[in-house]
A protein has these predicted regions:
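Alpha-helical bundle regulatory/interaction domains
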Residues: 1-83, 89-93, 107, 125, ...
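HTH DNA-binding helix-turn interface
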Residues: 100-108, 151-159
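Short Lys/Arg-enriched helix C-cap and helix-to-coil transition segments
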Residues: 112-113, 163-164
């Protein structure tokens, strides 16, 4: 779970920062880059990266099982109240937040919001007729304003523009960074 077992530092310390890959991976990162560039097949490129990451994995730094279980609950139940999903965690809420930041770089609430938004896009992308109020309540939002605020925070524009520009049909989960659509 998370990148901590690969980097060896709490991932939250890297949030909102641009870091040189050499700081974490040494000169080997240049060699890996050169190998990737030489491959034409995408599968071959990913195989190089996968092999490299598996070599870097420090099994002693993997997430505790109870943390993996919480993450799994958040992912599998994206429309539930996140506090309900966290109540069975055996330690304090502060400890849970610290562990999430260490392994994932985010709080449990932020992860849950991401999972909910991804599931929301999946629902929108598969609906032929979209009735926003139904979607708002189906996805666990208190009201339409919270739904629109979350949508705008994640993709930069409101849900109507997402539909108007056909992102739900042409390129699900990929949309223009141009806020005008």
């Amino acid at each position: 779970m998370g990148a901590y077992p690969f980097f060896g530092v709490p991932i939250s310390t890297l949030n909102d920062k641009v870091q040189q890959a050499e700081l974490f991976f040494g000169e080997q990162v240049r060699e890996i880059r050169n190998e990737i560039v030489q491959k034409e097949n995408v599968k071959d490129k990913f195989k190089i990266i996968e092999t490299w990451f598996l070599q870097m994995l420090d099994e002693s730094k993997t997430a505790p099982q109870e943390l993996v279980e919480v993450l799994s609950k958040l992912q599998n139940q994206p429309f539930s109240k996140h506090n309900e999903l966290l109540k069975d965690y055996p330690k304090t809420q502060k400890h849970l937040i610290q562990q999430f930041k260490k392994y994932c770089g985010l709080t449990p609430k932020a992860m849950h919001r991401i999972f909910r938004f991804n599931k929301l896009l999946e629902i929108i992308n598969h609906k032929k007729e979209i009735i926003w109020t139904d979607i708002v309540y189906e996805t666990g939002y208190a009201d339409q304003s919270h739904f629109i605020k979350d949508f705008r925070n994640f993709c930069g524009f409101n849900p109507s523009i997402y539909i108007k520009n056909g992102y739900n049909e042409s390129t699900p989960n990929f949309f223009s960074l141009d806020k005008e659509g």
